[in-house]
């Protein structure tokens, strides 16, 4: 999860912007973890009741909550039925936490703005089993807005920036990975070779002509980043194919800033089966067939 949090911070900062222009169910972008310090960490901290009069020890029997370890997908919450068994039911959208920030809002494929991803998934859950619910997905982060059509010339430029951005994200993770465990040892070894290559094009707002020349000149530097990104997305399940749901963590933050995102991913699905295989993904980024290797998805 730490990798994805950092991943989206990179998305918000760089946004794959071109020189002429300024990150199952879709995954929520931010996970908030809080940890309560143990009693005794502060020298003056005492347990409640430390100075109370001694009383007879009585063993307290605490009933285990059946929902405690029962996981429900986004849009559902756990409830206990008449047999004290946990079950997942649709969450009431009105029970979602109130959000006021514009970046908390999300846009659905129904072109409707939802107050938060919680409100979106709760609404989607209530539509389960319907045609509308089947077609409804989280489209992008932020309120709905006009997304201009992607021209053919713009579509050819998109993978140039995306490829370069993937390479730079990996290099940044590598440089900041001393204690964060953002990359595995195998991944670090692959990125190290790219990082130490003096011919590497440094991060920056480059023209598409320069990006195209660099890809041709330093083609081998881009092979692993493309495979790595596929592996980051192929998670639910890990089956060698990317569904609309699995693409969401990458698509959702990009669409408001890169209007060719949707058309690009649609074009990657060469056989129109609603899934993008590794071969289709790599081909979309210009990786040659002989260089597509499942063992690089690590």
Swiss-Prot record:
PROSITE patterns: KAZAL_2, OSTEONECTIN_1, OSTEONECTIN_2. CDD domains: EFh_SPARC_SPARC, FSL_SPARC. Residues 1-17 form the signal peptide. It comes from the Eukaryota. Detected in aorta, skeletal muscle, calvarium, vertebra, anterior limb, kidney, heart, brain, skin and lung. Glycans are attached at residue 111. One of its GO terms (biological process) is regulation of synapse organization. Ca(2+) binds at residues 269, 271, 273, 275, 280. It holds the Pfam family SPARC_Ca_bdg. It is found in: Secreted, Extracellular space, Extracellular matrix, Basement membrane. Appears to regulate cell growth through interactions with the extracellular matrix and cytokines. Binds calcium and copper, several types of collagen, albumin, thrombospondin, PDGF and cell membranes. There are two calcium binding sites; an acidic domain that binds 5 to 8 Ca(2+) with a low affinity and an EF-hand loop that binds a Ca(2+) ion with a high affinity. This is SPARC. It comes from Gallus gallus (Chicken). The lineage of its organism: Eukaryota, Metazoa, Chordata, Craniata, Vertebrata.
């Amino acid at each position: 999860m730490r990798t994805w949090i950092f991943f989206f911070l990179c998305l918000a900062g760089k946004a794959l912007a071109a020189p002429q222009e300024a990150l199952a169910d879709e995954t929520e972008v931010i996970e908030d973890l809080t940890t309560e310090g143990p009693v005794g960490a502060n020298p003056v901290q005492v347990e409640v009741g430390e100075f109370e009069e001694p009383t007879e020890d009585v063993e307290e029997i605490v009933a285990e909550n059946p929902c405690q370890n029962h996981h429900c997908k986004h849009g559902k919450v756990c409830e206990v039925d008449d047999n004290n068994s946990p079950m997942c039911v649709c969450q009431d959208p009105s029970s979602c936490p109130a959000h006021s920030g514009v970046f908390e809002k999300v846009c659905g494929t129904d072109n409707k703005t939802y107050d938060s991803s919680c409100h979106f998934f709760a609404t989607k859950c209530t539509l389960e089993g319907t045609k509308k619910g089947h077609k409804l997905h989280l489209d992008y982060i932020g309120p709905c807005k006009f997304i201009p059509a992607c021209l053919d010339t713009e579509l050819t430029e998109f993978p140039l920036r995306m490829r370069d951005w993937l390479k730079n994200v990996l290099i940044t993770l590598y440089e900041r990975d001393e204690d964060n465990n953002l990359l595995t040892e195998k991944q670090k070894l692959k990125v190290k070779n790219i990082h130490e290559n003096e011919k590497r094009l440094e991060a920056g707002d480059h023209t598409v002509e320069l990006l195209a020349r660099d890809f041709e000149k330093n083609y081998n530097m881009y092979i692993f980043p493309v495979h790595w990104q596929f592996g980051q997305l192929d998670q639910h399940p890990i089956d060698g194919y990317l569904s609309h749901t699995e693409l969401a963590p990458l698509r959702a933050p990009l669409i408001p800033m890169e209007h060719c995102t949707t058309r690009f991913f649609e074009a990657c699905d060469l056989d129109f089966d609603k899934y993008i295989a590794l071969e289709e993904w790599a081909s979309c980024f210009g990786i040659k067939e002989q260089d597509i290797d499942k063992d690089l998805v690590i």
